[in-house]
Amino acid sequence: MCIRDSLLGPDLQLFRLLDSAVLEPVSAIVVLGGSAPLRALEAARLYKDGWAPEIILNQALRRETFYAFSSLGIDLVEQHEYNREALLRSGVPEKAIMVIEEEVENTYAELRAVLQALPEETTLIIVTSNYHTRRAAAIWNHLTGGQVKGLIRWSRSDTSFDPTTWWKNRRSKRFLVNEYMGLIIYWLGFPLGIAFL
């Protein structure tokens, strides 16, 4: 057995990077930013399977490049717009899609904005990528004190990270390191660390 397998195991279960809840009907489905449109496609499947009557999207923080293009008269399509279009083309009606107006730049800000925008009794399915599930769950539990149900689900369309062969792919190694660094910062409770989650 190699050191990699003894520390992490081929399926990453020792350090529990991956997390996924058993589904049950909820108030809404939240699509976390990133990996457009793959997370939105999973949300559309969940919606059509009857798990929730509404899908929530966040708007990413507009950075300097957005405004530079805009000043040149170049219109950029933002990620939430791609996701919205993917939902519509997947058969989700427009009235079932909610876009939160607040611009956000990380998972913590996304989930905080969702929590602030919805009624207290809301329950959610939170869709992300498989490598991001543990951190998303930790942040949600931190924000809600574990009092608001948020079921974590990864997108089956997003195959960018394979937990059984992650060490063979540079991108997967980067995902793994980034997620563990985020979790370590979170677990250590660094005051500034929360901004990076």
Predicted regions and their residues:
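Transmembrane alpha-helical segments
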Residues: 7-9
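A structural signal for short, hydrophobic/glycine-enriched beta-strand patches
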Residues: 11-168
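A transmembrane-helix-recognition feature enriched in membrane-embedded lipid enzymes
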Residues: 169-196
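Conserved small/polar residues in nucleotide/adenosyl-binding loops
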Residues: 1-5
